[in-house]
């Protein structure tokens, strides 16, 4: 998935962390909407906010810069880059939040129906992937035994 950050005319010191709908799309869970959400370091946020002072947002302490199609946050529910970037997947010019941390963010917002649906999609993917690995490691005799047991 290619995301062109050049419109920002900004050099990040750490790769921005892709979250939200585009991260859902990256994992093949659903298509994203028009906006592209990132979390960045406090250092990068301070510099980006200085560059776009008229594009700042504050959602209950979560500070963001909303410019072009990007919503770029210092934190989400006060969880910062260092917390959310653990086990992120490196891409060209940015990172993608781990599936487990994406699940965590969706759980925090699950009172909103859209995010509850996302939560279900992520849980289903995690379980499907885990059981696929388990199944592939079984011998054909073990697979046959399970198939007979469940028919």
Set out the residue ranges of the language-model regions:
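Compositionally biased terminal segments of proteins
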Residues: 1-151
